[in-house]
From Swiss-Prot:
The keyword Lyase applies. This is Putative pterin-4-alpha-carbinolamine dehydratase. SUPFAM superfamilies: PCD-like (SSF55248). Signal peptide: none annotated. Keywords: Lyase. It catalyses: (4aS,6R)-4a-hydroxy-L-erythro-5,6,7,8-tetrahydrobiopterin = (6R)-L-erythro-6,7-dihydrobiopterin + H2O. Its EC number is 4.2.1.96.
Length: 118
């Protein structure tokens, strides 16, 4: 679906039902496109830990990520700590991972790589 443009440039679409749950072959295609992210929970979620120098930068990242989540209408689970954020994506409405999770993972990584919180 998003193969013609980079994931970070794609936008989330409403996805409901198990027809939108990604199979193993598609997961294997998409995972290399989001370096640093890992499959978790037997392939039902996508996670990555982002590290920061201090709490201020951690929260700045969380706030910027909230804007992305709002714009895409796709919201991660977050574990917020003093110097790191654990981000977890999964699409509850499909019972696992969807294209939206990979789109948002790519956008999240791009935010971090741009050093938006430095």
């Amino acid at each position: 679906m998003t193969d013609l443009i980079p994931l970070e440039q794609a936008h989330c679409l409403p996805r409901k039902g198990s027809d939108h749950k990604l199979g193993e072959a598609r997961l294997a295609e998409l995972l290399p496109q989001v370096p640093g992210w890992e499959l978790a929970e037997a392939g039902m979620a996508l996670t990555r830990t982002f590290r920061f120098a201090d709490y201020y930068r951690t929260l700045a990242f969380v706030n910027a990520l909230a804007w992305i989540a709002h714009r895409e209408d796709h919201h991660p689970d977050l574990g917020v700590h003093y110097d790191r954020v654990v981000v977890r994506y999964s699409t509850h409405d499909v019972g696992g991972l969807s294209e939206n999770d990979f789109i948002c993972a790519a956008k999240t990584a791009q935010l971090y790589d741009q050093g938006i919180t430095a």
